[in-house]
């Protein structure tokens, strides 16, 4: 449950009012209606004349944002109902020289104006500031009359961006195992005679005389203490399985049986890579009427794609939203964290959205829809938490 956040000061512009913590400070910003800073967050309000609907303005925003900053990723969008005007909340993450930045963009229209309120803070502080940011956003109220035209249907959202690929060195299973064995040890010249050792030399990870270049030493350093990785395992709709493991900044994309690609990345790039694998992008999130399903039924649906059972007819008839989700191709992802025996299990239904499995009690497993932004937060918690 979110902790109540005290908001003591009210700020007002010609288009809105909001409440914020007393410790936040107003700053001069000639190009903005309002600029506030505090708790590592920067809040900016801008407005301009517009007679377009919220659907038109939201579609325009989703089309424009990814091109505004190279590498910006949209992680979610939702209708917003507390502003007193038609509104949408868009969440995104963008690269920055000092570290990735998480943004919340509240957009609303009054029929005469479009108002944009953004709150940005470091991605590393995203989870710590979520309650505060949410409280400020929920305090926002439009001061102009809302348009009389109701928005009856939600607008179409953009298609998914291409899944990013890991740019690194591909190694066979034996070579990868040999590389891991070098962490914290001296190079054994005898390994030069093995196929795995020769592969490491050919890829440049090991020198021809058995030396370990500095980049290789940095790459294998997390393995010296037998540190356990954060692991993202996925079962794809065609039945294939993939695995992405991250030891801080050392990443392996592959399995023990087939080998994989190894690379060293800033941990924020690892988050971006995993978000792409999960298929995180803006999608509308609607709750299922059904809160739990037969545990065996759900276990078979999240298991081998070739044995996926049908949803019982009575459940499908009572919950059409769940029936559509169940019928779509699934990617089942497990996020495993060191020291946590139970993984976070997330289901992505192609073209629809996300759901999450929960506890099993009395033969039934909790199963609820989830927003892409919340799934993204699970990644942040696992990799940066």
Predicted regions and their residues:
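Surface-exposed amphipathic alpha-helical segments
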Residues: 22-24, 117-152, 370-385
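Short, amphipathic alpha-helical interface elements at domain boundaries
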Residues: 146-201, 205-211, 215-217
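Secretory pathway targeting signatures of secreted, lumenal, and periplasmic proteins
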Residues: 2-68, 78, 99
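Long, compositionally biased intrinsically disordered terminal regions
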Residues: 174, 178, 271, 277-385
């Amino acid at each position: 449950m979110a902790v109540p956040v005290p908001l003591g000061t009210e700020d007002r512009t010609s288009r809105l009012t909001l409440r914020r913590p007393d410790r936040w400070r107003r700053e001069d910003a000639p190009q903005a209606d309002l600029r506030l800073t505090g708790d590592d967050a920067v809040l900016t309000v801008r407005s301009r004349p517009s007679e377009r609907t919220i659907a038109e303005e939201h579609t325009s925003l989703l089309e424009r944002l990814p091109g505004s900053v190279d590498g910006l990723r949209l992680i979610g969008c939702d209708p917003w109902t507390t502003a007193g005007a038609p509104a949408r909340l868009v969440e995104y993450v963008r690269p920055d020289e000092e570290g990735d930045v998480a943004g919340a963009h509240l957009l609303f229209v009054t029929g005469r104006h479009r108002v944009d309120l953004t709150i940005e803070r470091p991605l590393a502080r995203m989870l710590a500031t979520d309650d505060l940011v949410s409280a400020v956003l929920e305090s926002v109220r439009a001061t102009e009359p809302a348009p009389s035209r109701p928005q009856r249907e939600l607008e179409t959202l953009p298609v998914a961006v291409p899944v990013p690929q890991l740019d690194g060195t591909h190694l066979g299973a034996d070579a990868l195992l040999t590389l891991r064995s070098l962490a914290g040890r001296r190079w054994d010249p005898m390994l030069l005679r093995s196929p795995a050792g020769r592969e490491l030399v050919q890829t440049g990870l090991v020198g021809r005389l058995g030396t370990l270049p500095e980049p290789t030493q940095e790459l294998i350093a997390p393995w010296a203490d037998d540190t356990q990785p954060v692991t993202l395992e996925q079962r794809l709709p065609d039945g294939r399985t993939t695995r992405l493991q991250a030891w801080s900044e050392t990443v392996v994309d592959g399995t023990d049986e087939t080998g994989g690609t190894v690379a060293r990345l800033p941990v924020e790039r690892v988050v971006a890579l995993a978000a792409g694998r999960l298929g995180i992008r803006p999608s509308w999130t609607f709750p299922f009427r059904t809160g739990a399903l037969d545990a065996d039924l759900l276990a078979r649906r999240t298991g081998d794609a070739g044995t996926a059972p049908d949803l019982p007819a009575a459940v499908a008839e009572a919950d059409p939203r769940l029936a559509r989700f169940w019928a779509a191709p699934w990617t089942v992802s497990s996020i495993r964290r060191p020291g946590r025996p139970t993984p976070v299990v997330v289901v992505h239904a192609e073209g629809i959205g996300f759901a999450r499995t929960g506890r099993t009690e009395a033969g039934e497993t909790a199963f609820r829809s989830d927003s892409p932004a919340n799934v993204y937060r699970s990644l942040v918690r696992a990799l940066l938490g």
